[in-house]
């Protein structure tokens, strides 16, 4: 095994580098023990990309052995888009769209026209190509292919619901989609460099990340760039927000403009929808409903997302 290939900062990529090295040295079987979906997806991609016939297996901690070769064969040419799909729908370094799991993401990948997703992770890809690919993927994922932008899709979804949907269930805004697409592009760029001795030298601040000083002296943190633009038109926020706020005598629900409109209060209201301040009974009902549905971060996943995410690819 070559010692010179393990120069990547990510352990997942190092695992793939050693896998490729083992294949080059004539290994008949490469058996990797991992519970990481990222590792599984990257293995499938490289099995297809490099045309590997060596028996590739990934064993999960529960003893389940997954055939990488069979998965790559099942996906066929869609393997070319699998890294982009995985990064856009949530991986170790990117967040995931609430309520949209890998089953939905794979269906969207199969529907996205032609080779549109292929540009993600390619060094020569332009901002325009990455943005178009990311937008198309999310519009497809949310069944909003008739919309031109994600902002329009958000409005359309909100308008068609009988009750206001939780904001976290809406597609990202156009600006956040752009930043998110850049972060996904960078991650796929690194995954696609697993066969190289060194990872590509990049400035992460050009890919939806920003550097900030940590609490410790000399500590530098890399954080996702946050967009400060409004999530909806100011006029719309004025319509669906109330003026109830802390420091004033609590208003009755009947006097709350949101309650009068049949809406729960949100963070855009003066009361911020805060349980200790908000008097809107609809807000309280929504909070209780969300609490009953589950409070953990993983509970935002849909029923299609079992613990065995890899099964969605097979």
Q: Model-predicted segments: where are they?
A:
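Noncatalytic, typically N-terminal accessory segments of nucleic acid-processing enzymes
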Residues: 1-98, 102-314
């Amino acid at each position: 095994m070559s010692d010179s290939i393990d120069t990547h900062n990510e352990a997942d990529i190092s695992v793939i580098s050693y896998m490729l090295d083992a294949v080059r040295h004539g290994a008949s079987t490469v058996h990797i023990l991992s519970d990481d979906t990222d590792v599984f997806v990257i293995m499938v991609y490289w099995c297809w990309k490099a045309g590997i016939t060596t028996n590739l297996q990934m064993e999960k901690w529960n003893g389940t052995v997954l055939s990488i070769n069979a998965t790559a064969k099942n996906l066929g040419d869609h393997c070319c888009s699998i890294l982009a799909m995985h990064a856009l729908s949530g991986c170790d370094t990117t967040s995931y769209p609430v309520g949209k799991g890998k089953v939905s993401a794979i269906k969207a990948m199969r529907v996205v026209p032609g080779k549109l997703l292929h540009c993600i992770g390619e060094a020569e890809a332009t901002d325009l190509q990455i943005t178009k690919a990311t937008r198309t993927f999310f519009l497809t994922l949310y069944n909003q292919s008739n919309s031109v932008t994600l902002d329009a899709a958000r409005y359309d979804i909100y308008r068609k619901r009988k009750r206001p949907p939780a904001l976290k269930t809406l597609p990202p805004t156009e600006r956040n989609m752009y930043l998110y697409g850049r972060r996904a592009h960078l991650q796929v760029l690194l995954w696609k460099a697993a066969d190289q001795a060194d990872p590509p030298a990049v400035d992460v601040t050009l890919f939806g990340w920003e550097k900030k000083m940590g609490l410790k002296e000399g500590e530098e943190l890399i954080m996702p760039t946050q967009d400060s633009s409004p999530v909806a038109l100011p006029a719309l926020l004025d319509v669906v927000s109330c003026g109830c706020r802390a420091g004033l005598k609590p208003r009755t629900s009947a006097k709350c403009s949101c309650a009068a409109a049949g809406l729960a209060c949100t963070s855009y209201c003066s009361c911020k929808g805060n349980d200790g301040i908000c008097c809107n009974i609809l807000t309280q009902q929504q909070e209780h409903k969300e609490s009953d549905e589950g409070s953990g971060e993983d509970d935002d996943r849909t029923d299609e997302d079992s613990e065995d995410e890899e099964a969605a690819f097979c």
